[in-house]
A protein has these predicted regions:
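Residue position within the beta-strands of beta-propeller blades
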Residues: 58-61, 115-119, 157
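Structural signature of eukaryotic scaffold interfaces centered on beta-propeller domains
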Residues: 47-52, 107-111, 148-149
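N-terminal export signals
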Residues: 6-24
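Blade-loop segments of beta-propeller domains
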Residues: 45, 73-116
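Beta-propeller blade signature
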Residues: 76-83, 130-132, 189-197
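Surface-exposed loop and turn segments in beta-propeller and other repeat-based domains
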Residues: 35-40, 93-99, 202-207
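Beta-strand-rich domains and repeat architectures in extracellular enzymes and scaffolds
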Residues: 34-73
Length: 207
């Protein structure tokens, strides 16, 4: 039977052998930056579809400042990087509805190899932009989105203005005072919304 000292010695030798084996294993992938300064680039949340179906294009947000929270006047650019053409930046549009945590929800629409969606602001209201990257045509839907159904036909979203007060950093700035105690508790006219991506029709699911 091994005593404690022998057990620790053998365990240490086994660990060294494992590390030695790792040291001789060649790297399986090469990592490189695909965006360049002087502007700042980031992607947003990890659950978004950022790679095109063929893995050639990668979506990203672009902004010219950092170190402070965005205001309702701040805008960003959205684009995609062509990884097969010297990581060339392709500008797709802009957004005035975004935050540092999640950007403007920029992503490929599930099930599509040509449609990209993001949130924006128009006439004081949050909206969804849907761009066909092959025809360069853009549709605007009258409400924002947070996530899509797996088939990309339905979108779901919270109240981003209310979220900016209840969870600063995750909603979109409106200029309103961020005082949670001044909000109406559990209002009947807002909550989690469902939107038809074909028609833009919206329905309140939960309050």
């Amino acid at each position: 039977m091994l005593d404690r000292r022998d057990f620790l010695r053998l365990s240490a030798l086994a660990s060294l052998g494992t590390l030695a084996g790792c040291a001789t294993t060649p790297a399986a992938a090469r990592i490189r930056p695909i965006t360049r300064g002087p502007k700042f680039h980031w992607r947003g949340y990890y659950d978004k579809f950022l790679f095109s179906a063929d893995d050639r294009f990668v979506l990203a947000n672009e902004v010219d400042f950092e170190g402070r929270s965005p205001t309702k006047a701040d805008s960003i650019r959205v684009g995609m990087v062509d990884t097969q053409d010297g990581d060339r930046w392709i500008d797709l549009g802009g957004s005035n509805a975004w935050n540092w945590q999640q950007g403007c929800m920029l992503q490929w629409v599930p099930g599509s190899d040509r449609h990209v969606a993001w949130n924006d602001r128009e006439d004081g209201q949050f909206v969804t932009r849907v761009l066909d990257v092959k025809s360069n045509r853009t549709r605007t839907l009258p409400h924002p989105f947070y996530t899509f159904s797996p088939d990309g036909k339905t979108a779901f979203a919270p109240d981003f203005a209310r979220l900016d007060v209840t969870r600063p950093g995750y909603g979109y700035a409106t200029g309103a005072e961020r005082d949670i105690w001044k909000l109406k508790p559990a209002p009947d006219d807002t909550g989690i919304w469902r939107m038809d991506m074909a028609t833009g029709q919206q329905r309140l699911l939960f309050t």
